[in-house]
Regions:
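Crotonase-fold acyl-CoA enzyme core
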Residues: 1-90
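C-terminal alpha-helix plus adjacent terminal tail
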Residues: 52-53, 84-157
């Protein structure tokens, strides 16, 4: 969901990832190359590994990261600044950025991502994973992550 947001703020130690790419291709991964470049997007898509909040900022996936304890306060400060700008100006400012993204081909990228998602939904691997999910969500997700030792199967400190 964060991939499609205008602004993203995370905790330094956040764990951001998309493990579902190990078993099926999700629709919102089409934003990854636009946000963090081809190589970082490719690594996340091919491994399903997570990145920290600090890495998310350095990759361009998030705007800023803060200590977990101060995250809410810092985001509220930013929201208060955003709220001081008249809404009609904010609408134009957002439109200006979105128009530039469209000029750079993002609309075609979204369309291509949607086509890839349609193909992926009919792949053998996705169909098998959907059957596993229908049989038991926790078991299917644990099976997906077990081989990698992360997400659901990661050892807790």
């Amino acid at each position: 969901m964060a991939a499609s947001c205008d602004l993203v703020y995370v905790a330094n130690d956040a764990e951001i990832g998309y493990p579902v790419v190990r078993s099926m291709s999700p629709p919102d991964n089409q934003f990854f190359p636009w946000l963090m470049g081809m190589r970082n997007a490719m690594e996340m898509m091919l491994t399903g590994e997570s990145i920290s909040g600090e890495e998310a900022v350095s990759y361009g996936f998030a705007n800023k990261c803060f200590d977990k304890e101060s995250l809410s306060d810092e985001v509220i400060k930013i929201a208060e600044k955003v709220a001081k700008v008249p809404s009609d100006i904010q609408a134009i400012n957002k439109r200006a950025v979105h128009r530039q993204m469209e000029a750079m081909g993002m609309r075609n990228g979204i369309r291509a991502g949607t086509e890839m998602q349609a193909l992926a939904m009919h792949s053998k691997s996705t169909q098998e994973h959907l059957k596993e999910l229908a049989s038991g969500l926790k078991e299917a997700l644990t099976k997906r992550d077990k081989e990698f030792g992360d997400y659901r199967t990661k050892e807790k400190d």
